[in-house]
UniProtKB/Swiss-Prot annotation:
NCBIfam families in the record: mutS1 (TIGR01070), PRK05399.1 (NF003810)
Entry-linked InterPro entries: DNA_mismatch_repair_MutS, DNA_mismatch_repair_MutS-lik_N, DNA_mismatch_repair_MutS/MSH, DNA_mismatch_repair_MutS_C, DNA_mismatch_repair_MutS_clamp, DNA_mismatch_repair_MutS_core, DNA_mismatch_repair_MutS_N, DNA_mismatch_repair_MutS_sf
Pfam families: MutS_I, MutS_II, MutS_III, MutS_IV, MutS_V
The organism's place on the tree of life at top rank: Bacteria
Name of the molecule in the record: DNA mismatch repair protein MutS
Length: 853
């Protein structure tokens, strides 16, 4: 904002603007003036750049021209969407006074603040993604983290113990807006994130947080929510709730509870694992060819969002998982009937949030009515499903016959977008409204009669009666006949080819009609607000219904996917281990144009590490990732792509697969690789599933091999995690001979002339060849380069059978094996004392050593 020294020098309107802007200095202020939202000074300059709109000037105030930009009020949603997507927040200032009775500027106030994390408008949200507001707090004992989805009322908190866990939570939740304390120490953790908001320390005070939360939930303490002993999480939650209330400028009745998310309740995946497994986002940042893209054929947006939450938080409670499995099995015969009906339910969850915020639009209520109309048919279909969990969902979804009847009587079939447009409340719902409408709607008949009468009376055949929003009712006569207008016709408007007049009788009728229209619209708005009052007492039951419908959508979807994609129900076992028969990669098998080669896997305490060798493009990474994805799918309760699966307890999934430079943090590829490896070695347990791909390739051969060997030893002997260890260091294939619990498997290929065929089939034992030059040729490396490489390979192999790491056989020398017998020359040198030699003796020793070499 430009500094204005003399406040009194401004016009009254600009004084009002400056007072409001001073209350919201950090964000854009949309200041309502008639049919436009105006922005002034620095706000105008910023908005013109962000929105690509014209920057103009509005006269002068305090002797200086005022930069100004404006947007039409009817198009505000489009502009808000653009700003929110760029991480901006906007204060919406409306006229609340009556211009007709106002002395000086019309009274205005900020009615809501639109921020990236607190939006609930349908036009601003991505319907199949959660939109989270989050707050982060840190003290000497760790982090506190809270998230709120204001569009559903879902409120969660957690207490990540360390930086890695906090980073994983940030990646999992991906908040649209993140609040942090002004003294937050770990800025490198959040730098570069969208929607960062620095907040004062007092907003994170624990006593204030407890008071805020108890007030919100109507409780005396927080014991019932299981969060009483989570002080760091509560500090974050208190700040977050206060911010939500400040921005919405209303109560938040749909936020009725808070849930503690504990690490031990779900399978932990760090940020690298979520990225590498491409659960909901591929490595390029898109949604194509991800696990969610294959599994998500849900028919409601709220079901899609729930499925993605399941995928990012696999549960460890086998009772929950067995219940989901049983439900999926029971629903498989009913998917074709249930999905078309569920599709009609729509996004009831977000509609209810807008109802709670009293921002629901007429079409929201029409959609709610349509959702209620599906419930009897859904309940009838589910009655035939022999499953206790399904029947529990059926009860939770309710029927709401009274509310359905209310909305059928109150709202017309296809209402307009906004209640201010009128025509929302159905005829017959309110007698007084019908009377005012009859008076207003009778205008058409009256005008037709008046036009016929005046034409006959004046004899003017061009005379017609009309209406426009600016000038009201008028009698129009062509320019050629205007000189014949009767004396009682008073000119109202001159056009190029016509004149428009008013007569006392028409003016009287206009006042009467406009009064009736105004009163009808005012009454309609009042009745619309009263509908909120009738619906809101049922909010808790309605939210339970929406949650049950979303869960039903997810389970019906997983049943359909299991049947369509030939998935099988996995079996949970008590001991650590994974046994897969004919396993397939859920994503790769969908994008291949040829049959996917299924492969087995056997991991157990006695066979806890597989050393995987084979050519590049042979399928090692696919084999590893498919194992992790099958485990992940099993732990959301889904069926899995395999013939048979037995899976034991898993506490964490780690992946060290691929790497790139992290230039923003100044970390090389190798540094990124080692950081991820360190995280695995510090945090993995015997119940963890670990994928290690090409450890050590970012440094010299000897360094890399040494690190890979030591990491493999540590994982197999000390941690005893279930590990898939892919490598091109063929020396590692000797590990099974040196330690218990390690086995070799490989993926083979066949060479024929200059071509290579990858078999993609996993076999026991180590690979016999790396096929690196064949893959290079396949990639299009020039023939002369390949030819030279073959020559160099033969040279290296003649020097050391191990130098090229191409052939593996019984005679291969390990880089890490004991050295051969020391040469005579070296032995002679070791026994020699140079200080005791005479010059002649030294010369003789040189000749003698020469003969020994």
């Amino acid at each position: 904002m430009s500094t204005i020294e003399n406040f009194d020098a401004h016009t009254p309107m600009m004084q009002q603007y400056l007072k409001l802007k001073a209350q919201h200095p950090e964000i854009l202020l949309f200041y309502r003036m008639g049919d436009f939202y105006e922005l002034f000074y620095d706000d105008a300059k910023r908005a013109s750049q962000l929105l690509d709109i014209s920057l103009t000037k509005r006269g002068a105030s305090a002797g200086e021209p005022i930069p100004m930009a404006g947007i039409p009020y009817h198009a505000v949603e489009n502009y808000l969407a653009k700003l929110v997507n760029q991480g901006e927040s906007v204060a919406i200032c409306e006229q609340i006074g009556d211009p007709a009775t106002s002395k000086g500027p019309v009274e205005r106030k900020v009615v809501r603040i639109v921020t990236p994390g607190t939006i609930s408008d349908e036009a601003l949200l991505q319907e199949r993604q959660d939109n989270l507001l989050a707050a982060i707090w840190q003290d000497s004992k760790g982090f506190g983290y809270a998230t709120l989805d204001i569009s559903s009322g879902r409120f969660r908190l957690s207490e990540p113990a360390d930086r890695e866990t906090m980073a994983a939570e940030l990646q999992r939740t991906n908040p649209a807006e993140l609040l942090y304390a002004e003294d937050f120490a770990e800025m490198s953790l959040i730098e570069g994130r969208r929607g960062l908001r620095r907040r004062p320390l007092w907003e994170f005070e624990i006593d204030t947080a407890r008071q805020q939360l108890n007030l919100q939930f109507g409780t005396r303490d927080l014991v019932g929510f299981g969060v009483e002993n989570a002080p760091r999480g509560l500090c974050a939650a208190g700040c977050l709730l206060q911010y939500a209330k400040d921005t919405q400028r209303t109560t938040l009745p749909h936020i009725r509870s808070i849930t503690m998310e504990r690490q031990q309740d779900s399978i932990i995946m760090d940020a690298a694992t979520r990225r590498n497994l491409e659960i909901t986002q591929n490595l390029a940042g898109g949604a194509e060819n991800t696990l969610a893209s294959v599994l998500d054929c849900t028919v409601t947006p709220m079901g899609s969002r729930m499925l993605k939450r399941w995928l990012h938080m696999p549960v460890r409670d086998t009772r929950v998982l067995l219940e989901r499995q049983q439900t999926i099995g029971a629903l498989q015969d009913f998917t074709a009937e249930l999905q078309p009906v569920l599709r009609q339910v729509g996004d009831l969850e977000r509609i209810l949030a807008r109802l709670a915020l009293r921002t629901a639009r007429p079409r929201d209520l029409a959609r709610m009515r349509h959702a209620f109309q599906q419930l009897p048919e859904l309940r009838a279909q589910l009655e035939n499903v022999d499953s206790a969990p399904v029947q529990a969902l059926r009860e939770k979804m309710g029927e709401f016959a009274e509310l359905r009847d209310l909305l059928e009587r109150a709202i017309i079939d296809t209402p307009p977008v906004l209640v201010r447009d009128g025509g929302v409340i159905a005829s017959g719902y309110n007698e007084e409204l019908d009377e005012w409408r009859a008076l207003a709607d009778g205008a058409t008949d009256y005008l037709e009669r008046l036009e016929v009468r005046e034409r006959e009376r004046t004899g003017l055949d061009t005379l017609k009666v009309g209406f426009n929003a600016v000038h009201g009712y008028y009698i129009q006569i062509s320019r050629g006949q205007s000189h014949l207008a009767p004396i009682n016709y008073m000119r109202r408007q001159t056009l190029k080819n016509a004149e428009r007049y008013i007569i006392p009788e028409l003016k009287e009728y206009e006042d009467k009609v406009l009064t009736s229209k105004g009163k009808a619209l005012a009454l309609e708005k009042q009745l619309y607000e009263e509908l909120f009052d009738l619906l809101l007492p049922h909010l808790e039951a309605l939210q339970q219904s929406a949650s049950a419908l979303a869960e039903l959508d997810v389970l019906v979807n997983l049943a359909e996917r299991a049947y369509t994609l030939n998935y099988t129900c996995p079996t949970f076992i008590d001991k650590p281990g994974i046994r897969i028969t004919e396993g397939r990669h859920p994503v790769v098998e969908q994008v291949l144009n040829e049959p996917f080669i299924a492969n087995p896997l056997n991991l157990s305490p006695q066979r806890r590490m597989l050393i995987i060798t084979g050519p590049n493009m042979g399928g090692k990474s696919t084999y590893m990732r498919q194992t992790a994805l099958i485990a992940l799918m099993a732990y959301i309760g889904s069926y899995v792509p395999a013939q048979k699966v037995e899976i034991g307890p898993i506490d964490r999934i780690f992946t060290r697969v691929g790497a790139a430079d992290d230039l923003a943090s100044g970390r090389s590829t190798f540094m990124v690789e080692m950081t991820e490896t360190a995280n695995i070695l510090h945090n993995a347990t015997e119940y963890s599933l670990v994928l290690m791909d090409e450890i050590g390739r970012g440094t010299s051969t000897y360094d890399g091999l040494s690190l890979a060997w030591a990491c493999a030893e540590n994982l197999a002997n000390k941690i005893k995690a279930l590990t898939l260890f892919a490598t091109h260091y063929f020396e590692l294939t000797q590990l099974p001979e040196k330690m218990e619990g390690v086995a070799n498997v490989h993926l083979d290929a066949l060479e024929h002339g200059d071509t290579i065929a990858f078999m993609h089939s996993v076999q026991d034992g180590a690979a016999s060849k790396s096929y690196g030059l064949a893959v290079a040729a396949l990639a299009g490396v020039p023939k002369e380069v390949i030819k030279r490489a073959r020559q160099k390979l033969r040279e290296l192999e003649s020097i050391s059978p191990n130098a090229a790491a191409t052939q593996v056989d019984g005679t291969q020398m390990s880089l890490l094996s004991v050295p051969e017998e020391t040469s005579p020359a070296v032995e002679a040198l070791e026994n020699l004392d140079p200080d005791s030699l005479t010059p002649r003796q030294a010369l003789e020793w040189i000749y003698r050593l020469k003969s020994l070499v």
